């Protein structure tokens, strides 16, 4: 399953999302969701402890001027790689 988080982590229940995540899933942080990947964010450790791979959409990180502040443990991906994730996963859940 591909989970997309497009809202600020302060506006969604990330713990509810993480209860659904299984090994082999991917979590894509996009739009305001990229704030969850800030290296000093209380959410980044919680996300990285999940069994899913966590990535952030590079264009959204850049658009918010956060490139230098994103955790080095979070990979950034292009739109092409985002499309590849949608092909990889038959199901997607937006948060």
From Swiss-Prot:
Protein family membership: Belongs to the DsrH/TusB family.
Subcellular location(s) per record: Cytoplasm
InterPro entries: DsrEFH-like, Sulphur_relay_TusB, Sulphur_relay_TusB/DsrH
Subunit structure, as described in the record: Heterohexamer, formed by a dimer of trimers. The hexameric TusBCD complex contains 2 copies each of TusB, TusC and TusD. The TusBCD complex interacts with TusE.
Pfam family, one: DsrH
Main location: cytoplasm
Record's function text: Part of a sulfur-relay system required for 2-thiolation of 5-methylaminomethyl-2-thiouridine (mnm(5)s(2)U) at tRNA wobble positions.
HAMAP family tied to this protein: Thiourid_synth_B
Gene: tusB
Keyword entries, A-Z: Cytoplasm, tRNA processing
Keyword Methyltransferase tagged: no
Top-level division of the source organism's lineage: Bacteria
GO terms under cellular component: sulfurtransferase complex
Disulfide bonds: none
Organism listed in the record: Cronobacter sakazakii (strain ATCC BAA-894)
Record's protein name: Protein TusB
GO biological process, one term: tRNA wobble position uridine thiolation
